[in-house]
Amino acid sequence: MFLKFHRSPGLPDVLAVCDAELLNTTLKKGDVNVQISESFYGNLRVTEEEVKEALRKAENINLMGERAVALAIAAGLASRADCIMIGTVPHVQIYRL
């Protein structure tokens, strides 16, 4: 998986995680194209344990892919019903308020 924290002064960090095979691909659903880019998901390849640790700390989370989403579900942060499918790929966004 690839992971990147987006940091902006005065705003909560955003954690972006995608499954490795999705990086630099484009997903399609109807008229919508979603680019899974290195600029958003980063180029830092991480283990499941590193993703789990990041999920514990993050306030805003963007996950793309079966493995990334499954970690959030296993951690109790999301459910399958919270996901949308982009083609055959699950995607979920989590916001802690």
Regions found by a protein language model. Name each.
Residues 71-97:
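C-terminal structural segments of small proteins and small subunits
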Residues 49-75:
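Mid-chain, well-packed structural core segment of small domains
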Residues 45-51, 65, 92-96:
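Short C-terminal domain-edge/linker segments immediately following a structured domain
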